Curated annotation (Swiss-Prot):
Gene3D superfamilies: Transthyretin/hydroxyisourate hydrolase domain. Homotetramer. Dimer of dimers. In the homotetramer, subunits assemble around a central channel that can accommodate two ligand molecules. Interacts with RBP4. GO terms for cellular component: extracellular region; extracellular space; protein-containing complex. This is Transthyretin. Residues 1-20 form the signal peptide. The keyword Cell inner membrane does not apply.
Amino acid sequence: MASLRLFLLCLAGLVFVSEAGPAGAGESKCPLMVKVLDAVRGSPAVDVAVKVFKKTSEGSWEPFASGKTAESGELHGLTTDEKFVEGVYRVELDTKSYWKTLGISPFHEFADVVFTANDSGHRHYTIAALLSPYSYSTTAVVSNPQN
């Protein structure tokens, strides 16, 4: 149990450090950003396919945005402030394809993060995931938009 707490503390610290660094052009205005790290190799997880869905009033999921993580393990520019309205969203990381390209047979097909966004006013969200072939952990940093 203590090792799990230490692991989660380290993950939260990593997200904090990545958020505290200098923002590049456009990054500070990105309302939804995804960061994926490979726990086996200790590096950013590159080319992870990411799909974002928005829950409809009927309860089904409609495609909202998609992309792949860059060399930094980050995916920016998924949406705009105007499109990222209050609602329930699902971020789906294609973990199986990522591990298969590395020659590893993983347990999970996907890693999903489901969350309510902007219910307390407009915010910016960083969803961070730490992947290994048989587990994953996620956390989020929710902040006020920077002008």
